């Protein structure tokens, strides 16, 4: 039985009895999992490799639907609807719930066009409006001052840390309500990692954030709530300080203290 804190706040998402099985797999990667996600807070998911945390993260905006024959059941509630139904508009969903991947994924186009890409998909064609929204997004991602004089340059000429902030700018440009971060700093140097962590904390005021990380120190630094997963199950979810200082589950304590990993 999982230990899950009662969150007396508005919820960005709520998961109920969610189970996910990859195509051709015999055992679910996520098993009957339930959890709330607090609105305008940062929730970290930690646990050893293969525990199901990235599988769960990618379920929040149905990224698994890009591949056939995966199976899922249960509910993931967002804006008072179960997003797992066949009626869900996945393009709209992925605008409302954006994702930042482990490896920076700058598109092979200019810096400006990278950020404008999603805006154009939304039907925004007016150049003045596009320019304003692109500038705002780049400022929100703390990269405007570094790129404002080279917006027409190829985005792949940016450093790794800059490309990751560009990806964040591209995601926030379409004004999502939730952002999903999948190991967003694992490919970056310590200085770039610090910058991304500061940015994630700043973004919390505008969006709800869920971050998967193998770095427990990172989870402790940036998150408000932390969930520990093991073998596809949520073992414990609580306030981050309590999870790291006074965990209620023995398995959580053993993982936090490095007895396994």
Swiss-Prot record:
Its main location: membrane. SMART domains: AAA. Part of the ABC transporter complex PstSACB involved in phosphate import. Responsible for energy coupling to the transport system. GO terms for biological process: phosphate ion transmembrane transport. It comes from the Bacteria. This is Phosphate import ATP-binding protein PstB. Keywords: ATP-binding, Cell inner membrane, Cell membrane, Membrane, Nucleotide-binding, Phosphate transport, Translocase, Transport. The keyword NADP does not apply. The keyword Translocase applies. Its EC number is 7.3.2.1. It is found in: Cell inner membrane. The complex is composed of two ATP-binding proteins (PstB), two transmembrane proteins (PstC and PstA) and a solute-binding protein (PstS). One of its GO terms (cellular component) is plasma membrane. Residues 13-256 form the ABC transporter domain. GO terms for molecular function: ATP binding; ATP hydrolysis activity; ATPase-coupled phosphate ion transmembrane transporter activity. PANTHER family: ABC TRANSPORTER I FAMILY MEMBER 17. InterPro entries: AAA+_ATPase, ABC_transporter-like_ATP-bd, ABC_transporter-like_CS, P-loop_NTPase, PstB-like. It is a peripheral membrane protein. ATP binds at residues 47-54. It comes from Sulfurimonas denitrificans (strain ATCC 33889 / DSM 1251). It catalyses: phosphate(out) + ATP + H2O = ADP + 2 phosphate(in) + H(+). Belongs to the ABC transporter superfamily. Phosphate importer (TC 3.A.1.7) family.
């Amino acid at each position: 039985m999982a230990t899950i804190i009662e969150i007396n706040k508005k919820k960005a998402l709520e998961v109920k009895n969610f189970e996910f099985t990859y195509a051709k797999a015999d055992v679910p990667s996520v098993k009957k999992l339930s959890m709330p996600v607090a609105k305008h807070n940062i929730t970290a998911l930690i646990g050893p490799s293969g525990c199901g945390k990235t599988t769960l993260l990618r379920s929040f905006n149905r990224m698994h639907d890009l591949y056939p024959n995966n199976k899922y059941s249960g509910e993931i509630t967002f804006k008072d609807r179960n997003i797992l139904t066949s009626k869900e508009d996945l393009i709209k969903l992925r605008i409302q719930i954006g994702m930042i991947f482990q490896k920076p994924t700058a598109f092979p186009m200019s810096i400006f066009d990278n950020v404008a890409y999603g805006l154009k998909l939304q039907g925004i064609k007016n150049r003045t409006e596009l320019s304003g929204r692109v500038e705002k997004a780049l400022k929100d991602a703390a990269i405007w001052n570094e790129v404002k004089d080279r917006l027409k340059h190829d985005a792949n000429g940016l450093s790794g840390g800059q490309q990751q902030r560009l990806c964040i700018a591209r995601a926030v440009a379409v004004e999502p309500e939730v952002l999903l971060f999948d190991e967003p700093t694992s490919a970056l140097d310590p200085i770039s990692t610090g910058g991304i962590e500061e940015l994630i904390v700043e973004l919390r005021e505008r969006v709800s954030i869920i971050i998967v990380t193998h770095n427990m120190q990172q989870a402790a630094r940036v998150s408000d709530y932390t969930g520990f997963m093991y073998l596809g199950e949520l073992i414990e979810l609580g306030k981050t300080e309590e999870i790291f200082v006074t965990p209620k589950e023995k398995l959580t304590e053993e993982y936090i203290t490095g007895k396994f990993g």
